A protein has these predicted regions:
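Membrane-interfacial loop-to-helix junctions in multi-pass inner-membrane proteins
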Residues: 86-94, 145-155
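Alpha-helical transmembrane segments of multi-pass inner-membrane proteins
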Residues: 32-40, 45-47, 67-75, 101, ...
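Hydrophobic alpha-helical transmembrane segments in multi-pass integral membrane proteins
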Residues: 55-105
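Non-cytosolic membrane-interface motifs at loop->transmembrane helix junctions
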Residues: 117-127
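N-terminal membrane topogenic signal
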Residues: 21-37, 92
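Juxtamembrane "helix-exit" motif on the non-cytosolic side of transmembrane helices
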Residues: 47-53, 107-116
């Protein structure tokens, strides 16, 4: 019996069909998804709204909601004109995502703060946001394509975010993100929490940069040429991680690097790595 890799098992049934079997409506779905991905990579990390860190979570939430709603409406229109929701029978990825949603529904139903679970009590990470995450994951798995431009756009976003963060570390307040004339150095004294860059608090910034570094370094080394410039935002990200005092990032960073290991292996060794990471 032929072996199937873990990656193929998880994505079976949600990857785009081959080009020759795609209808015009499905190609429009692919085009919309391409623009959706670019929009998220370019705008979401950098958008800060109009009230600085005081309202940053809400600004990013409504941006994500608006962009996702426009994309979903476009996809729905394409589905009404001939595009198929699945290229073939739904695979494990689809059912795992549905299980994720069911888990969130059960959690919300059993929560003693049930009335606050829909949006997330000011943090905007509630049930509605989890639904958007699932919609994004399934849509990109179905109509997304692997493109180098995505890494380049993400690298540009990381560069700009880190440039703002470095300015703040040096004592500045670009974009007026800190209120009342405060600075990054005032964290823990004049205000609670730590905020840096255009992402928000340093914990979230650390998670984003921890994911970015291995992706940017891998792409730069593999593609070479002008893509070696991606090493610049990667280096900036490492320095910002160090100065942000986000200790959890130094746990997340090795984990993110481990996720890149299957890209460096082939054949049986790659299957072993995928199995180990899945376990």
């Amino acid at each position: 019996m032929r072996e199937l890799s873990a990656a193929k098992l998880l994505t079976e049934g949600v990857h785009p069909m081959e080009e020759r079997s795609m209808t015009k409506a499905e190609k429009r779905c692919e085009w919309l998804t391409d623009k959706y991905i670019l929009c998220l990579l370019a705008l979401f990390p950098l958008f800060t709204g109009f009230h600085g860190y005081a309202n940053l979570a809400a600004a990013k939430f409504w941006l994500y909601t608006g962009v996702t709603a426009l994309w979903a409406l476009g996809i729905a229109a394409c589905l009404c004109t001939g595009a198929r929701l699945f290229a073939k029978k739904p695979g494990a990825f689809f059912y795992l995502t549905c299980a994720f949603l069911v888990w969130n529904l059960v959690s919300a139903a059993l929560s003693p703060w049930r009335e606050k679970t829909f949006l997330g009590a000011g943090r905007y990470d509630g049930l509605f946001t989890q639904f958007l995450y699932a919609l994004t994951a399934l849509g990109i798995a179905r109509w997304g394509r692997k493109k180098i431009i995505y890494v380049r756009v993400f690298g540009a976003s990381v560069f700009l975010c880190c440039a703002v963060a470095l300015w703040q570390i040096a004592g500045g307040n670009p974009l007026g993100l800190y209120p009342n004339g405060w600075r990054f150095a005032d964290a823990g004294t004049l205000y609670s929490g730590m905020y840096l860059g255009t992402v928000g608090n340093t914990l979230i910034l650390g998670s984003v940069l921890s994911l970015a570094v291995p992706v940017l370094v891998y792409t730069a080394v593999k593609k070479r040429g002008y893509d070696l410039l991606l090493l610049l935002p990667a280096a900036m990200a490492l320095y910002v991680l160090y100065r942000s005092e986000c200790s959890s990032a130094w746990v997340a960073l090795p984990g993110s690097c481990a996720l890149m290991l299957p890209k460096l292996a082939r054949g049986r060794r790659r299957r072993y790595i995928l199995a180990a990471e899945g376990a």
